[in-house]
From Swiss-Prot:
The lineage of its organism: Eukaryota, Amoebozoa, Evosea, Eumycetozoa, Dictyostelia. Its EC number is 2.3.1.-. Belongs to the transferase hexapeptide repeat family. Keywords: Acyltransferase, Transferase. Gene3D superfamilies: Hexapeptide repeat proteins (2.160.10.10). This is Putative acetyltransferase DDB_G0275913. The keyword Nucleotidyltransferase does not apply. Disulfide bonds: none annotated. GO terms for molecular function: acetyltransferase activity; O-acyltransferase activity. It is an enzyme of class 2 (transferase).
Length: 190
């Protein structure tokens, strides 16, 4: 029995993989074709349909503004009532999972892709990634950058321009470069 993983399987699991693999090149090309249609459509229902084809999973109520950029799309999972403003970038070589009622302001960048620190390894052309997870009710401010391996809990607010280099729990406002907790968010009981 052959248990050899494909480059796509390695990529999605966060292992070193070859981005020049034929299947991965085809996946990026297919994603770019869908993105081109999305970014040039004036019809919001058509854009929603394209998003549902492109993303791995979505809630029913989603809205994304053009322009949108992704690597593959199939590693992006967004919950119900998701909104992304203009210029969202998803480098989705590993899963990017976003909960329900989440909002991305303009030019938010989510990078699950990374490269080896060692120059010899980096020059080999192999890459790897780390998943990004964002909880329910998150609001990511304009121009924020979320780096590989970050997990943000529920009800997190990320200030505009923040560079999020590490994970944070629920109910906090974070901002800065690198991002740090600015304040805790009191949660009202229902």
């Amino acid at each position: 029995m052959d248990t050899k993983m494909t480059e796509r399987e390695k990529m999605t699991k966060g292992l070193m993989y070859d981005p020049g693999d034929e299947e991965l090149c085809k996946g990026r090309t297919e994603a770019r074709q869908l993105i081109h249609r999305f970014n040039n459509s004036m019809d919001k229902l058509e854009r929603k349909d394209i998003t549902k084809q492109l993303f791995g999973s979505t809630g029913e109520k989603i809205y994304l503004e053009p322009t949108l950029r992704v690597d593959y799309g199939y590693n992006i999972h967004v919950g119900e009532n998701f909104y992304a403003n203009f210029g969202a970038i998803f480098l989705d070589i590993c899963p990017i999972t976003i909960g329900k009622n989440a909002m991305l302001a303009p030019n938010v960048q989510l990078y699950s892709a990374t490269h080896p620190i060692d120059p010899t390894e980096r020059n080999s052309g192999l890459e790897f990634g780390k998943p990004i997870t964002i909880g329910d009710n998150a609001w990511i401010g304009g121009g924020a950058i979320i780096l590989p391996g970050v997990t943000l809990g529920d009800n997190v607010v990320v200030g505009s321009g923040a560079v999020v280099t590490r994970s944070f729990g629920s109910n906090v406002v974070i901002a800065g470069n690198p991002a740090k907790v600015i304040k805790e968010i009191p949660v009202k009981s229902e």
